[in-house]
Amino acid sequence: MEIAKEKSGAKPEFIDNEDESLRESIVIFDFGSQYSLLIARRIREMHVYCELVSHDTPWEKIAHLNPRGFILSGGPSSVYEAGAPLAPAYIFESKLPVLGICYGMQAITHQLGGVVEHSEKREYGHALLHSSVANSDLLSDMPEPSPVWMSHGDRIEKMPAGFTALAYTENCPVAVMGNEADIYGLQFHPEVVHSPNGKIILKNFVFNICKCHANWTMGNYIQESIHNIREQVGDGQVICALSGGVDSAVVASLIHKAIGDQLTCIYVNNGLLRREEADRTLHVFKNHMGMKIIYVDAVDRFLDSLSGVTDPEQKRKVIGSEFIKVFEDEACKLGKIDFLAQGTLYPDVIESVSSVSKASAKIKSHHNVGGLPAHMKLKLIEPLRYLFKDEVRLLGKELGLPDEMIWRQPFPGPGLAIRIIGEVTREKLEILRAADWIVMSEIKKAKMYHQVWQSFAILTDVKSVGVMGDFRTYGYLVAIRAVTSEDAMTADWAKLPYDLLSVISNRIVNEVKEVNRVVYDISSKPPSTIEWE
């Protein structure tokens, strides 16, 4: 589908476009739900491209995506609140399929002339979904009944003209609705794991109703990215920050594949790395990547900048700013450098901005997107900014990166600075490195390294009294953090065996003399974040 050329201010005119050489997409409008990004993940898992955009995004901003359908996310608002977000009118004018989820369903109802009312019986948690009709394209192959996850206080009192109730729950007579124009609404969340058959509904919408093809692969993404990188860079020169993690490794490999020796990689030792991190990283890159690499020892520079800084947000800003200064300095030494490459991922972008929906609060600045000073002289190139972590790993595999690089656990850009609560000092860094080395060694020995998303130690600013032999001690408290996750947007604490935790704790208090107490963090995300700072 294309938008016809039009005079300024005229209504958009939609034209069917069956050219399959154009990449198809599903466009998801974000109304502020904590699950919005999860919808995008579910669509991507089907090998169909999608993007999450603000609910008020104009057509001109998404026309290039060649949308085959629209999804309206859930959200915390009520359609009758002053300033409540609504769907753009063009989605209904486009004649393309629309699926509203929770608040998205209520927005459809309200905008198309139905009635939404506050429900006396709110539904939060599990419910059983029962079909109201014999056949439905949206509910095809759904078990009867099917458990779903409800989270709403408003309900549909009267459907818009032409709509039919397709399914119900005990407290929700219109749990699913639809019309002949392929506009549908769900009063539950099919994207969450608590709706075990929700993927069936999403697949029905994407393939049977929107007629998408499962042709978005990492191989295609590589070719498209190479083309885009060459177009963006031209004859320019690029420097890429190597961190040792999979994100920067994939970025470097992808850009090198596109422009070869126009890329120079810079590995900065900022003094915030784990034990043996620098040596291991340089070894892997020199032996497997075959790129130009510059090693920069900036330990004193970073630690001096962090002196006296205790606020976690300020730490991130200081580190991000100092990184840019280092790269600018190195760029001057190299001559004319035009671009800085970064491994920014989709969740980084979503979590760092106030929201694509303007309805969610900023959680924390990401080191790749929040710490950049306004005066930065280098232009950014971020070829992974629309990918999830698991997609980056698949991309790395497609690019031929070694498994030891692809399957490394994520390590934050600010490094150990945000795993030390309070001021970062050389003494605290050595304590944390020793404790973290023990955690990682024992996790690997127990063959659980690839079963958890991240595992690490945190050096708190708490000290407590202990006894070692016949002597009183007053040492630091170290926390152990291990989580399971798919994409870092949500995470659950890992149920590590007690015996393993016991070994880790005993080793830390015996081998790291400044520590006399170890605790295990059993918080999930949300409400906690994975990192403590």
Swiss-Prot record:
Gene3D superfamilies: 3.30.300.10, 3.40.50.880, HUPs (3.40.50.620). Its EC number is 6.3.5.2. GO terms for molecular function: ATP binding; GMP synthase activity. Keywords: ATP-binding, Glutamine amidotransferase, GMP biosynthesis, Ligase, Nucleotide-binding, Purine biosynthesis. One of its GO terms (cellular component) is cytosol. PANTHER family: GMP SYNTHASE [GLUTAMINE-HYDROLYZING], GMP SYNTHASE-RELATED. This is GMP synthase [glutamine-hydrolyzing]. It comes from Dehalococcoides mccartyi (strain ATCC BAA-2266 / KCTC 15142 / 195) (Dehalococcoides ethenogenes (strain 195)).
